[in-house]
Amino acid sequence: MMKRILLAEDDNDMRRFLVKALEKAGYHVTPFDNGASAYDRLREEPFSLLLTDIVMPEMDGIELARRASEIDPDLKIMFITG
């Protein structure tokens, strides 16, 4: 089964780069440009990994990670920043 990554990154260039690199490595990536939208999707379906920027509009990565852990305590979370 293909690993599913939820990506929250507000920088368009970085988001496109990460999607391309991760998909090339065989992952299914669902990208969002803010934490609030990523959180909404996480409430609808499971993911193997949350890859999130820290500073974003609407909901920052720290808050997204906190809320994501409440939904799925086993979800792996990685922070990125640039």
Question: How would you label these PLM feature ranges?
Answer:
Residues 13-24:
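Charged docking surfaces used in two-component/phosphorelay signaling
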Residues 26-33, 41:
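Short hydrophobic/Thr-rich beta-strand motif most characteristic of the beta2 strand and flanking loop
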Residues 56:
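Receiver (REC) domain active-site loop signature in two-component systems and cognate sites
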Residues 34, 60-64:
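Acidic catalytic/metal-coordinating carboxylates
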Residues 45-51:
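Active-site beta3 strand of CheY-like receiver
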Residues 1-6:
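Non-catalytic signal-transmission and effector/linker regions of two-component phosphorelay proteins
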